[in-house]
């Protein structure tokens, strides 16, 4: 039986929901794109039609993030995990270490990959405040004097932890923004490298973005695959090999959609409203709990637990029947998780809160 998609809200952590308007446009254009009689998936990545798609996508992203001219925007393959290797291979130079700030699972995953190429200097920034998980302020991070760069993950999707400040350092700051890019305003000029897997706030899986400051290009001293070499990708305009053209095209549509919403500043206002609505309800309830201190709560990923964990399966089943999809928490932490990326409308979060109220009344 076909479900009314107007009443379905997808809370998946990634691949995540795409804006409905983007999906509808892609659907309309799928078979006959721009009157060519073919799909955008079927044309050459070096055709003038696709070159225009690529150039517009880059310019729109530059506009949205106010990216300075001395940064390259690279459309990469391999997702953020490929960047876990690309970062040390491109940035270490003659150095033997880099400082990695450990704020959670994904930061730790980056460390494990970096160990293949250097001896990471790991600073554990995790702490507790009033019995809740938190992260030490950046002013307290210890950065090795000999570090080639400082790497951190501003948003941990699994734990629902967000880091909102930056250290004062002369080292290049590298940020894995896979789950937070385009969700709030940032000053790109404070970073050396920003990278992000696409499948949360950019587009479908299969592509990643790397924003690299010009002076960090060409530093690689180690042998590294050309496909991961920032300098090669910059020189070839992200077309060293055949790129994932459909993912690139869809990402471009998302950028245009976001500009139509008023840009990052406007979407940040909506994102803060969505997060406040959900956190406020959880905090006033004795039936639901979020274990992250308010100072480090994620705007994008809201994990929560039931007072009666034995009801988890029932909660998920009934939520799914209401059109509230993909609320199961990550296997590492269990419970529930609502991922409320840019494409999630306020109405979706309100529908979730209404369901949570109803469930609490029936099962508390």
Curated annotation (Swiss-Prot):
Binds 1 pyridoxal phosphate per subunit. The keyword Transcription regulation does not apply. One of its GO terms (molecular function) is O-phospho-L-serine:2-oxoglutarate aminotransferase activity. Its cofactor is pyridoxal 5'-phosphate. GO terms for biological process: L-serine biosynthetic process; pyridoxine biosynthetic process. PROSITE patterns: AA_TRANSFER_CLASS_5. GO terms for cellular component: cytoplasm. Its main location: cytoplasm. It is found in: Cytoplasm. Disulfide bonds: none annotated. The modification N6-(pyridoxal phosphate)lysine is found at residue 200. Pyridoxal 5'-phosphate binds at residues 80-81, 106, 157, 176, 199, 241-242. L-glutamate binds at residue 46. Pfam families: Aminotran_5. Its EC number is 2.6.1.52. Keywords: Amino-acid biosynthesis, Aminotransferase, Cytoplasm, Pyridoxal phosphate, Pyridoxine biosynthesis, Serine biosynthesis, Transferase. The keyword Amino-acid biosynthesis applies. It comes from the Bacteria. Pathway: Amino-acid biosynthesis; L-serine biosynthesis; L-serine from 3-phospho-D-glycerate: step 2/3; Cofactor biosynthesis; pyridoxine 5'-phosphate biosynthesis; pyridoxine 5'-phosphate from D-erythrose 4-phosphate: step 3/5. It is an enzyme of class 2 (transferase). Homodimer. Catalyzes the reversible conversion of 3-phosphohydroxypyruvate to phosphoserine and of 3-hydroxy-2-oxo-4-phosphonooxybutanoate to phosphohydroxythreonine. HAMAP family: SerC_aminotrans_5. Belongs to the class-V pyridoxal-phosphate-dependent aminotransferase family. SerC subfamily. This is Phosphoserine aminotransferase. It comes from Vibrio parahaemolyticus serotype O3:K6 (strain RIMD 2210633). The lineage of its organism: Bacteria, Pseudomonadati, Pseudomonadota, Gammaproteobacteria, Vibrionales.
């Amino acid at each position: 039986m076909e479900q009314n998609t107007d009443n379905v809200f997808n809370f998946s952590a990634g691949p995540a929901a795409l804006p409905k308007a983007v999906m509808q446009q892609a659907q309309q254009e799928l078979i006959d794109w721009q009157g060519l009689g073919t799909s955008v998936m079927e044309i050459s990545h070096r055709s003038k039609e696709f070159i225009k798609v690529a150039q517009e996508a880059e310019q729109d992203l530059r506009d949205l993030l106010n990216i300075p001219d001395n940064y390259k925007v690279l459309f990469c393959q391999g997702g953020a995990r490929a960047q876990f290797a690309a970062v040390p291979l491109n940035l270490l130079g003659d150095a033997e270490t880099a400082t990695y700030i450990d704020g959670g699972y994904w930061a730790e995953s980056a460390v494990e990959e970096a160990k293949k190429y250097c001896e990471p200097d790991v600073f554990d920034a995790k702490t507790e405040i009033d019995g809740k998980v938190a992260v030490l302020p950046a002013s307290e991070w210890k950065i090795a004097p000999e570090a080639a760069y400082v790497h951190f993950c501003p948003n941990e999707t699994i734990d629902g932890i967000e880091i909102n400040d930056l250290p004062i350092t002369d080292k290049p700051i590298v940020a894995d923004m896979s789950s937070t890019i385009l969700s709030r305003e940032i000053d790109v000029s404070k970073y050396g490298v920003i990278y992000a897997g696409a499948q949360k706030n950019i587009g479908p899986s299969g592509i990643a973005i790397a924003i690299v400051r010009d002076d960090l290009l060409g530093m690689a001293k180690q042998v590294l695959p050309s496909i991961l070499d920032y300098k090669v990708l910059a020189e070839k305009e992200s077309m060293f090999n055949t790129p994932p053209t459909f993912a690139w095209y869809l990402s471009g549509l998302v950028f245009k959609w976001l500009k139509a919403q008023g840009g990052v500043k406007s979407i940040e206002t909506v994102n803060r409203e969505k997060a406040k609505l959900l956190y406020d309800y959880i905090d006033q309830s004795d039936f639901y709990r979020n274990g992250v201190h308010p100072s480090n709560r994620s705007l994008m990923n809201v994990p929560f637990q039931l007072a009666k964990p034995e009801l988890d399966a029932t909660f998920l089943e009934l939520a799914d029947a209401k059109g509230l999809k993909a609320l199961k928490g990550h296997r590492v932490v269990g419970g529930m998780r609502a991922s409320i990326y840019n494409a999630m409308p306020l109405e979706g979060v309100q529908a979730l809160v209404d369901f949570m109220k109803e469930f609490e009344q029936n099962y508390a």
